[in-house]
Amino acid sequence: MADLEAVLADVSYLMAMEKSKATPAARASKKILLPEPSIRSVMQKYLEDRGEVTFEKIFSQKLGYLLFRDFCLNYLEEAKPLVEFYEEIKKYEKLETEEERVVRSREIFDSYIMKELLACSHPFSKNATEHVQGHLVKKQVPPDLFQPYIEEICQNLRGDVFQKFIESDKFTRFCQWKNVELNIHLTMNDFSVHRIIGRGGFGEVYGCRKADTGKMYAMKCLDKKRIKMKQGETLALNERIMLSLVSTGDCPFIVCMSYAFRTPDNLSFILDLMNGGDLHYHLSQHGVFSEADMRSYAAEIILGLEHMHNRFVVYRDLKPANILLDEHGHVRISDLGLACDFSKKKPHASVGTHGYMAPEVLQKGVAYDSSADWFSLGCMLFKLLRGHSPFRQHKTKDKHEIDRMTLTMAVELPDSFSPELRSLLEGLLQRDVNRRLGCLGRGAQEVKESPFFRSLDWQMVFLQKYPPPLIPPRGEVNAADAFDIGSFDEEDTKGIKLPDSDQELYRNFPLTISERWQQEVAETVFDTINAETDRLEARKKAKNKQLGHEEDYALGKDCIMHGYMSKMGNPFLTQWQRRYFYLFPNRLEWRGEGEAPQSLLTMEEIQSVEETQIKERKCLLLKIRGGKQFVLQCDSDPELVQWKKELRDAYREAQQLVQRVPKMKNKPRSPVVELSKVPLIQRGSANGL
């Protein structure tokens, strides 16, 4: 029966994988719902306050670029050729061979540069033209040949073109997507969890599918009780920090994190799914690798280490078991549990795996940095070639003996190693950090320039264009079955409790890596959801044409901000009422959807603007004179933050203004009133008073 269950789990998992690759959007079991277009009023202020409404910020985001591109290509004729030129350059930069670049560079020059020069309409500098011409004459076609044009294209786009984008519906759509992104609160219900694919000290790893996009991931679940039992709280939190540091920027050689979230019992990392097994497994199945095969793996691992070191992260646990293969056979560095940030303070702890640890790591009290990883790389490459670490002779398992040999033994390299390989390993395995390859001031570049890698084009390595030595078999789960992986004994943690103080440790654990979420959405459901939302909004506009749209009321007035919130202002009401709110310098107005009358609350009536919590949901509490309360609930975190800020600012400024104006005796206070007409307060005045 157990065998049958294992087979069914494998089949289900493999089917999910195949469908996810073909049509991930069709596999989405939940839909992303974009908020109303009116969210723009709140989100634009929220993003502006954080310096996010700039050309550089929006153009560098995947969804921002796609919407800006759509606007330029379809709605702004003068920007269309600039964006087309930009996209052709980006395609050129990804070409694999010099021959392809020679042909394509000439085509780009003729179509986008020479044509404009002949028409006397070339909007770029003479320096940019001469730069490209000079290289083409010499038949030099580096990937960054057109970089001067990239800079000038962006310069031309960041002025009037960007301003027109900000005023367009495409920026409204950007605000809608950013609101969704900034309000992500993941739970287990957001994933379909498949079979177990691995187990570690604190928990287990499963294959899973994200419900709203259909994308497949690995879910690493750490048991909070097991963490507490092993006093591993610092390690668990450190792994989340290290993953957040290395998971930004383009690096296909690290198992990166897209999300982190928590449940009452677990901490979960959502990671890149690697289906090809690890190098330790393949070493045991395949036998030792040739120099050429090892070179292929080494090159990709070096780029992974370079990405970490550029972010001041030292990995500290490089070994074949931590190098995972994807379905195509390319490798990624996994498991950052022992990684450390050395940007402010160098570590000195002796951590890692015996046989791969650098001498400075083994020596107590000695500080180190990325140097440790280059020594470990030398040990690992030796193992791929010989089947054992250079300091683990005769299969000894005595850790003290292995450490002693690491600190004292001069490594003897076999005569069968090529001179280039010997040079590389001798450089990496130097006990003296000041003489070690990778530690002489230029980091990974020193290793990449080793004669052993002379035959490689590092751009081709980065683009994963070289065929890998080993392609994992398709249609198989390259992991042990659930029975062999085993499970934890729940009796171990039966008596362990998790009081509030323990849960508080993980309060800031949840995280979404923005660029990875945007990439996931762009690859799966972006076009579908945009098309559906366009249809819904068009229908709603037609429906609201007679009554007028809620946003129209704010036009031409001194409205600070407007948008939907839910209110609970009447003591006899127990349900939330969704209303459209308008914040003015001296009052807050609201109305129901499709309703003409407004309700009004003046700033003079408000005593304070506070944050409260109702049924574990953050709300805004407006205390009103006479002991009354007015509670508001927002649909998303950014809305709550911005409404709280703007209400407090308006209230404070109104109070300051009142203090400057002489008080009138016996003036009655205005109650909360229903308005069927424009209020007597002059709406078009500078401050409404």
UniProtKB/Swiss-Prot annotation:
- What is annotated as the active site? D317
Q: Name one GO biological process term.
A: negative regulation of relaxation of smooth muscle
What PROSITE patterns does the record tag this protein with? AGC_KINASE_CTER, PH_DOMAIN, PROTEIN_KINASE_ATP, PROTEIN_KINASE_DOM, PROTEIN_KINASE_ST, RGS
Keyword hit for Nucleotide-binding: yes
| Catalytic activity as recorded in UniProt | [beta-adrenergic receptor] + ATP = [beta-adrenergic receptor]-phosphate + ADP + H(+)
Q: Mind telling me which residues the site (Required for receptor phosphorylation) is annotated on?
A: D3, L4, D10
Q: Where does ATP bind?
A: I197, G198, R199, G200, G201, F202, G203, E204, V205, K220
What coarse category fits the chief subcellular location reported for this protein?
A: cytoplasm
Q: How is its activity regulated?
A: In contrast to other AGC family kinases, the catalytic activity is solely regulated by the binding of substrates and ligands, not by phosphorylation of the kinase domain.
Q: Which residues form the PH domain?
A: 558-652
Q: Known Pfam families for this protein?
A: PH, Pkinase, RGS
Q: What is its EC number?
A: 2.7.11.15
Q: What class of enzyme is it?
A: transferase
Domain of life assignment: Eukaryota
Keywords, in A-Z order: ATP-binding, Cell membrane, Cell projection, Cytoplasm, Kinase, Membrane, Nucleotide-binding, Phosphoprotein, Serine/threonine-protein kinase, Synapse, Transferase
Q: Its Gene Ontology molecular function terms?
A: ATP binding; beta-adrenergic receptor kinase activity; G protein-coupled receptor binding; G protein-coupled receptor kinase activity
Any one cellular component term from GO for this entry? plasma membrane
Q: What does this protein do?
A: Specifically phosphorylates the agonist-occupied form of the beta-adrenergic and closely related receptors, probably inducing a desensitization of them. Key regulator of LPAR1 signaling. Competes with RALA for binding to LPAR1 thus affecting the signaling properties of the receptor. Desensitizes LPAR1 and LPAR2 in a phosphorylation-independent manner. Positively regulates ciliary smoothened (SMO)-dependent Hedgehog (Hh) signaling pathway by facilitating the trafficking of SMO into the cilium and the stimulation of SMO activity.
Query: Can you state the subunit structure given in the record?
Result: Interacts with the heterodimer formed by GNB1 and GNG2. Interacts with GIT1. Interacts with, and phosphorylates chemokine-stimulated CCR5. Interacts with ARRB1. Interacts with LPAR1 and LPAR2. Interacts with RALA in response to LPAR1 activation. ADRBK1 and RALA mutually inhibit each other's binding to LPAR1. Interacts with ADRB2.
Record family assignment = Belongs to the protein kinase superfamily. AGC Ser/Thr protein kinase family. GPRK subfamily.
Regarding domains, what does the record say? The PH domain binds anionic phospholipids and helps recruiting ADRBK1 from the cytoplasm to plasma membrane close to activated receptors. It mediates binding to G protein beta and gamma subunits, competing with G-alpha subunits and other G-betagamma effectors.
The entry's protein name is Beta-adrenergic receptor kinase 1
